[in-house]
Swiss-Prot record:
Its main location: cytoplasm. This is Eukaryotic translation initiation factor 3 subunit G-2. It comes from the Eukaryota. One of its GO terms (molecular function) is RNA binding. Residues 189-267 form the RRM domain. HAMAP family: eIF3g. CDD domains: eIF3G (cd12933), RRM_eIF3G_like (cd12408). One of its GO terms (biological process) is formation of cytoplasmic translation initiation complex. It is found in: Cytoplasm. The lineage of its organism: Eukaryota, Metazoa, Ecdysozoa, Arthropoda, Hexapoda. SMART domains: RRM (SM00360). RNA-binding component of the eukaryotic translation initiation factor 3 (eIF-3) complex, which is involved in protein synthesis of a specialized repertoire of mRNAs and, together with other initiation factors, stimulates binding of mRNA and methionyl-tRNAi to the 40S ribosome. The eIF-3 complex specifically targets and initiates translation of a subset of mRNAs involved in cell proliferation. This subunit can bind 18S rRNA. The gene is eIF3g2. It comes from Drosophila ananassae.
Amino acid sequence: MKPFKTSWADEVEADYVDGLPPCSEYIEGDYKYVTEYKFNDDGKKVKVVRTFKIEKQVVSKAVARRRGWVKFGDSRLDKPGPNSQTTMASEEIFMLFMGSKEFEQTHETQMDAGKNIAKCRICNGEHWSVNCPYKGTSMDSKTLMESKANAAAAAALNDPSKPGKYVPPFMKDGAGGAGGKGRERDDSSAVRISNLSESMTETDLEELVKKIGPHTKMYLAREKNTGLCKGFAYVHFKFRQDAAAAIEILNGHGYDHLILCVEWSKPQP
């Protein structure tokens, strides 16, 4: 029996799917050429030739493992790699894999960029005050304030006749052991602090003067109707040298956006 023969037109038409020729591809050097046929929006048959450059890359084991996954659905018979008929390639994202040494260098660079955020109140260094190496030393603001207080107190005791300084009667030459006659209270260690803000409270006043020395009493002048601070206060220190230190340190000191004025309290009649 003779084999059944068909015409070449029938064989070509039988190979076409939906009236389109099959896709073809070939590799030439480092390039891969893929030829496809499809219908455009107008229903016309068009030929699409895509050119791929073949490159060899070193990828991580996870990426190589993903490329070997078995495809499913309409792409179960596709070869490794994307298929334009079932896969739409978006913008390529490049991933940079760094070793531990490179990560540490990058991390240190980022830390150096933001190191000026912290500023020490003690030595003005580029670190937090709690981590200052000079904390508790002579450069500490608290220690410096105590040193100024001691120096001012010593100057007040050693040089009571210096002009421009208030000297209580018991420290003047020829004075008796007792204070001035007719005085019921001793204001020799009292200071007047003025130019205070309206929001000043007794707690704020105590925080302001407690680092200088112990005090016996305080008085913060307030408005009767509003209860706001009138702008001045009196502080009676236990020791006169502490009062002198308060004037030396706090007079001209900026507090709550205002410049304080601290002076000896005038004797009250």
